[in-house]
């Protein structure tokens, strides 16, 4: 493998950062419903149980958490892991892969029996399949009570009420831009690491992707609203912030035109991701900042400068490239060439030489030749990608790529995928092995799932580390000496000087 080693170092130094912005005081009226969602307030007795099943990306996980927040707060529902005892059952769907709709209807069919035993169980379908299918879901599965899109989950209490009063299905798959964030309860931390959605949708319209059609075009949350949510989380012990968006580095958050902006005509009307990261870094208790998922077109010099100046910005970047062939990238409508992608990585490594870079790859895109695939493999060799995601192309109805002819046999696609994954996994394993003997900064997240007598956390380059330690370390950043590299994790011991 050529290029940089990608092994993170401990105690790295960065150039002095410029003066930053004053932080807002927590103000739940900026972005959230008033105090009923505040974790400091007692909840009323449970009025039923709620089950949520989530498919798909981290944004869906975030949305499901917000559904739970809304319904446990406003409807006094209690979460359950058992759909058979639930009064409300929701499935948050993903449409990124082929046959997603069939999987949803199959799951709904299994739940149908829960409505036939005399219980008034409400079944709802949310997420991207709901946005795509709309009324078709109710026509095909008339026992479904609610159909709602990613942008209307905050309306669930009203939809449930209307369903019970009118005794007919409720459908709302509209795109009310950023409205949902104005009606969500104050965020509740579930541990030392928290996700914060800063923008929704995507306006890039890659030829293979359904996101612009299911989540709408790019809409950014106001700058101060994001900081207010983070301020609430920081008061609850959150130490790591994960910024979310379908195209997160396209963030353009409107800034409050306060006195500083009035006296400075050159002040920007919005904050980009780099400026937002600088503002988050001013929270003393926030020790690590991450963001996902990015688009290479939006990977700006401002973001490179943030990596240069902000030590809290994790030494890891996930930047989906999809292919190393310019011909395929053009057919995908990605808007960049392989050389332009490498140029962005070169700029980043000039300020963070040891940064870990992961990516996404689509194999078997219509028309992909052996030469195209070899160019992808060459890019992998040139960059030295760490842990990455790779998939065989999945034709999505309604996207431009779904009309392209595809003559490549499935067997060849599978062979290419296996070849690519073998190389990516080898690179990742090599990086893990070379971390043995190093000292890594780890955010302790809680007990290990496999051994509750041990603790677990993540390194900056997203590797889980399991190690013996005192539970009082949970929620803290500690130094861990890495002693062993396993297939999907590391082992270590607490480092003492």
Curated annotation (Swiss-Prot):
- Origin species, per record, is Xylella fastidiosa (strain M12)
**Assembly mode:** Monomer.
The UniProt catalytic activity note for this protein reads: N(6)-dimethylallyladenosine(37) in tRNA + (sulfur carrier)-SH + AH2 + 2 S-adenosyl-L-methionine = 2-methylsulfanyl-N(6)-dimethylallyladenosine(37) in tRNA + (sulfur carrier)-H + 5'-deoxyadenosine + L-methionine + A + S-adenosyl-L-homocysteine + 2 H(+)
Name of this protein: tRNA-2-methylthio-N(6)-dimethylallyladenosine synthase
Top-level EC class as recorded in UniProt:
transferase
Please name every pair of cysteines joined by a disulfide bond in this record.
none
For [4Fe-4S] cluster 2, which residues are the binding ones?
A: 202, 206, 209
Q: What is its EC number?
A: 2.8.4.3
**Organism lineage:** Bacteria, Pseudomonadati, Pseudomonadota, Gammaproteobacteria, Lysobacterales
Q: Which residues form the MTTase N-terminal domain?
A: 48-165
GO MF annotation terms: 4 iron, 4 sulfur cluster binding; metal ion binding; N6-isopentenyladenosine methylthiotransferase activity
Sorted alphabetically, which CDD domains does this protein's record hold? Answer: Radical_SAM (cd01335)
- PROSITE patterns documented for this protein: MTTASE_N, MTTASE_RADICAL, RADICAL_SAM, TRAM
PANTHER family linked:
CDK5 REGULATORY SUBUNIT-ASSOCIATED PROTEIN 1 (PTHR43020), MITOCHONDRIAL TRNA METHYLTHIOTRANSFERASE CDK5RAP1 (PTHR43020:SF2)
The positions annotated for binding [4Fe-4S] cluster 1 are: 57, 94, 128
Instruction: Cite the cofactor comment.
Output: Binds 2 [4Fe-4S] clusters. One cluster is coordinated with 3 cysteines and an exchangeable S-adenosyl-L-methionine.
Q: Which UniProt keywords apply?
A: 4Fe-4S, Cytoplasm, Iron, Iron-sulfur, Metal-binding, S-adenosyl-L-methionine, Transferase, tRNA processing
């Amino acid at each position: 493998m050529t290029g940089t080693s990608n092994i993170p170092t401990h105690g790295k130094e960065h150039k002095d950062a410029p003066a930053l912005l004053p932080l807002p005081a927590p103000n739940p009226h900026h972005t959230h419903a008033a105090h009923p969602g505040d974790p400091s307030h007692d909840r009323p007795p449970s009025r039923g149980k709620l089950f949520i099943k989530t498919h798909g990306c981290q944004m869906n996980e975030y949305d499901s958490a917000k559904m739970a927040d809304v319904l446990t707060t406003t409807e006094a529902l209690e979460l359950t892991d058992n759909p058979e005892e639930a009064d409300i059952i929701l499935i948050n769907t993903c449409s990124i892969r082929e046959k997603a709709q069939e999987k949803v209807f199959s799951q709904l069919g299994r739940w149908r029996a829960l409505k036939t035993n005399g219980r008034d169980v409400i079944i709802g379908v949310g997420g991207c399949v709901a946005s795509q299918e709309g009324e078709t879901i109710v026509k095909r599965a008339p026992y479904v009570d609610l159909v709602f899109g990613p942008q209307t989950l905050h309306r669930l209490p009203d939809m449930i009420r209307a369903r019970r009063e009118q005794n007919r299905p409720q459908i709302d798959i509209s795109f009310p831009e950023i409205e949902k964030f104005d009606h969500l309860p104050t965020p509740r931390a579930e541990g030392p690491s928290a996700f914060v959605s800063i923008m929704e949708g995507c306006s890039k319209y890659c030829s293979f992707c359904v996101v612009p059609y299911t989540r709408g075009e790019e809409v950014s949350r106001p700058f101060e609203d994001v900081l207010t949510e983070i301020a609430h989380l920081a008061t609850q012990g959150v130490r790591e912030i994960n910024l979310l968006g379908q195209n997160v580095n396209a963030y353009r958050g409107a800034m409050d035109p306060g006195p500083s902006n009035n006296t400075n005509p050159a002040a920007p009307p919005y904050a980009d991701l780099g400026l937002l990261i600088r503002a988050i870094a001013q929270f003393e208790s926030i020790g690590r900042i991450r963001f996902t998922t990015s688009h290479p077109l939006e990977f700006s010099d401002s973001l490179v400068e943030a990596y240069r100046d902000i030590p809290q910005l994790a030494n890891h970047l996930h930047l989906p490239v999809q292919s190393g062939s310019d011909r395929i990238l053009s057919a995908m409508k990605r808007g960049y060439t392989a050389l332009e992608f490498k140029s962005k990585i070169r700029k980043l490594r000039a300020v963070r030489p040891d940064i870990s870079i992961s990516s996404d790859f689509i194999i078997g895109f219509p028309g992909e030749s052996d030469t195209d695939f070899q160019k992808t493999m060459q890019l992998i060799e040139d960059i030295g990608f760490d842990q990455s995601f790779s998939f065989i192309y999945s034709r999505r109805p309604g996207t431009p790529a779904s009309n392209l002819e595809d003559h490549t046999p499935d067997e060849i696609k599978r062979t290419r995928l296996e070849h690519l994954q073998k190389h990516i996994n080898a690179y990742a394993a090599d990086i893990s092995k070379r971390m043995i003997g190093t000292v890594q900064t780890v955010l302790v997240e809680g007990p290990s799932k496999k051994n509750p007598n041990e603790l677990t956390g993540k390194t900056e380059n997203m590797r889980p580390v399991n190690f013996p330690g005192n539970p009082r370390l949970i929620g803290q950043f500690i130094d861990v000496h890495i002693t062993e590299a396993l297939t999907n994790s590391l082992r270590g011991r607490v480092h003492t000087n």
